[in-house]
């Protein structure tokens, strides 16, 4: 058969392991899978929501973009919710508007928005636009809250400031989030909490 009783790694995976333990972990796992497993396990133990874990599995790992995209979607729904129809009889009102998403490809936040707003490519709600020449950053997303009946909508542009968030993390913890994988795990946990 294809199965094996031997394992590639047996031990702890979290932001709290030592650099030596980390090296023992990544040596047999290799590449992106090592970060994927570590970030998902660390996010789970940090108490990240089920929705973020599902999106991270879709995306491949938990990272600043995953958490930033989730934060953007939460803010979008809170401050610019879908407009709903008014019903005079019973039943649940339907959404009158839908979101059209204008992404700036390159950041993981795009995957998060695709997942959380169920806007996968086949649903034609997402368009990636190369806006590099305009000064838009990869952490920026545009949304059109579209009303198909009136053929009008509201343009909403949102982003997260990676430099500021990392500076806040460093000021609070003394840790440079970009110093290595263990530091990035600590940064993600800080963001989760």
Tell me what each language-model feature is.
Residues 1-62, 71-193:
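Non-transmembrane, aqueous-exposed alpha-helical and coiled segments at domain scale
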């Amino acid at each position: 058969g294809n199965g094996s009783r031997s394992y590639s790694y047996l031990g702890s995976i979290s932001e709290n392991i030592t650099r030596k333990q980390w090296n023992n972990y990544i040596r047999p796992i290799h590449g992106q899978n090592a970060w994927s497993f570590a970030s998902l396990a660390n996010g789970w133990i940090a108490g990240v929501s089920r929705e973020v874990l599902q999106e991270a599995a879709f995306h491949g790992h938990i990272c600043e973009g995953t958490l930033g995209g989730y934060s953007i979607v939460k803010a979008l729904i809170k401050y610019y919710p879908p407009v709903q129809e008014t019903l005079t009889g019973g039943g649940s009102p339907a959404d009158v508007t839908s979101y059209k998403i204008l992404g700036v490809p390159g950041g993981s936040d795009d995957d998060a928005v695709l997942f959380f707003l169920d806007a996968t490519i086949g649903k034609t709600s997402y368009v990636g636009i190369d806006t590099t020449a305009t000064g838009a950053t990869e952490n920026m997303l545009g949304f059109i809250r579209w009303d198909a009946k009136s053929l009008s909508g509201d343009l909403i542009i949102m982003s997260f400031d990676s430099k500021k968030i990392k500076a806040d993390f460093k000021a609070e913890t003394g840790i440079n989030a970009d110093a290595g994988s263990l530091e990035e795990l600590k940064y993600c946990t800080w963001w989760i909490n």
